[in-house]
Each structure stands twice: as C-alpha cells, then as structure tokens.
Amino acid sequence: MAAAELADTQLMLGVGLIEKDTNGEVLWVWCYPSTTATLRNLLLRKCCLTDENKLLHPFVFGQYRRTWFYITIIEVPDSSILKKVTHFSIVLTAKDFNPEKYAAFTRILCRMYLKHGSPVKMMESYIAVLTKGICQSEENGSFLSKDFDARKAYPAGSIKDIVSQFGMETVILHTALMLKKRIVVYHPKIEAVQEFTRTLPALVWHRQDWTILHSYVHLNADELEALQMCTGYVAGFVDLEVSNRPDLYDVFVNLAESEITIAPLAKEAMAMGKLHKEMGQLIVQSAEDPEKSESQVIQDIALKTREIFTNLAPFSEVSADGEKRVLNLEALKQKRFPPATENFLYHLAAAEQMLKI
C-alpha cells in the first residue's frame, strides 16, 4: 500500500451507533473501538435524536478537542427489520476535516444497518476502510478513501455566497481571521451554520488551517472550556443565547439577520483603514465577477493577502536567538503608515508570533 494511502486509512478513530426506540429513549448502542464517557455524551448531544419535536438533520459534523465527528441520522422505514427502532445515527470520529468523505461512508454504513440490523457488517466495512482504504458492497455501494482528497474539502464552501450576503463587511471576517481572532456564527439552522463556517478559513488560504473550525458547538460547559483553550477560532451555534456571551467572541455573526458585530474589546485591534478598504474592494470585485470560479476568488484573496505580508517583511528582523523573524517596531513606526495600517500590521505580527518577548 502506498504511503499516502496508508496515512489516509489511519485517520479514522472510531465508529458508533445511537438508536432511538419506539418508547422515545435514545441509547448509545455500540461502538468500535471503545470511547470515553465524555465523547459519548457529546455525540449523543450532537446527534439531535435527544431533541424533542425538532427536525432531523441528515448530516452534521464538528470538532471537539482535535477530534472531528461526523454523524448521519436516519429515520427507520416501517419495512425495516429494525422493528423497535424509529431512528438511528451512525457516528464516525476522525483526525481529519473531510465532511464529504465521511458523509459518503456513513451513508453506506446506514444502508448496511438498515438491511442487516446488526453492527457486525458495519464493523467489517469500517475495518476494511481502516486497513485498506476501501469497502465494496454490491447492494450498499462502494467507498474508496482516496476518492476524497482533503484538499477538495477545503475550498468546498462558497465565498461568493458570503460576499452576496455581507458585501464589503466580508473584510471584517478576513481581518478577524488574519489576526486569529474568535469568530462566533449564529443561525437557528445547523445546515446554514455549517456551510458558512466551513468556508471562512478559505479567506486566509495561505494558512490552510481548518483546525480553527468548530462548526457545531453547544453552550455546554465542557465544550466551551475546550473552545476557549484555542487562541483563535470559527465557532458555529444554533442557540441565540450565545449572543449574550461576549467572553466567547471578538466578532459575532448573526447569519439570520445578516449582521456582523465587533466586540468592544476587539475594536482597537480591528480598526479599519485604507488597507482594509482595498482588501474589501478586491474581495467584493472578485466574488461578484460571474466569470470567476470559487477557486479563482480564493486565489485572488490569497494574492492580496500575500501583499500584506510583503508590507510587513521590511520591518522584520532575525530574533536574537536566530530562530525566527520578529517585528522591529521602531522601523514600523518610522515608516509613518496611517494609524489604522500601522495598528493592523502590529496586531498581524502579534498573531504570527513575531513580537519580541
């Protein structure tokens, strides 16, 4: 097996099964290998089967303490051999961000469970993918890990959609991401939250960092503690109560109302000037061009972002220990940039860990 394939098969961490029975009880039925009580409780919360009178969400995903979770939820048809089960969820945990890959695999596992009513076939398929990167089944479909390149998962969202909703205000999101600030996104529909939040890291394409994404967070003490351990993040919520938690965000996005709010404590670092106006104009111009694809928009923003780092380069020097480049603040001040530009470059250097300690 090729090294790349081997690495890919080692990304999955576990598989689990949650059922809702005819009495309305939701039970963690089975998993392979074992899991912790904390993670089990989290996944029970995420699967939405415990929510009374709420719509089913066919597929949800998120991250908790560097473990990604992917959950497909199925309503059991009357014809199924699962006579005492009304709904069930298949849960996959993994080390990588790749919603399309794990949605495809969980759908196959769901079809297997509907047909056989036993986790045995699911476990066989899980182990086949874990060890060989493939599972084949005539009646349930085939799955091949290498068909789902992680690099395709990154640009899968739509920056054009974000710009059509927020226009020039998109630059606030770009600035917050550049400065590694905390962005909280609210919408009552989890599908809207996930689609929007997964796209945001593409605004800082040079980092290729989707570990900042926490697309489905509950106002739960353990989840919030895990979130607050991160320096900067993009976190999605479906509970409007999060708007009353300014300790959780520097920028709050109310998707339902198309509003972006900068928290008072973040306003100084997020002060906008000529540099931001130019960036905003470029983002809008590129995104509104019908001839340009999503990937071209990402590349346009990435090129302009590189220019910003080029602006910063003349004011950096090798640190005393020779290990990294640090900001020469005096040189930056002598350049006499407009205050907002100087302020932004200083905070960008801080985000890139270029300040002298």
Curated annotation (Swiss-Prot):
Domain cDENN: 159-299
A Gene Ontology term for the protein's cellular component: late endosome
Annotated GO biological process: protein transport; regulation of early endosome to late endosome transport
Ranges in a coiled coil: none
Residues annotated as signal peptide: none
UniProt keyword Metal-binding present: no
Keywords, in A-Z order: Endosome, Guanine-nucleotide releasing factor
Transmembrane domains' residue ranges: none
UniProt KW Iron keyword: no
Chief location of this protein within or outside the cell: other
Domain of life, source organism: Eukaryota
Entry function: May be a guanine nucleotide exchange factor (GEF).
Protein name from the UniProt record: Putative DENN domain-containing protein 10 B
Organism whose genome encodes this protein: Homo sapiens (Human)
Gene: DENND10P1
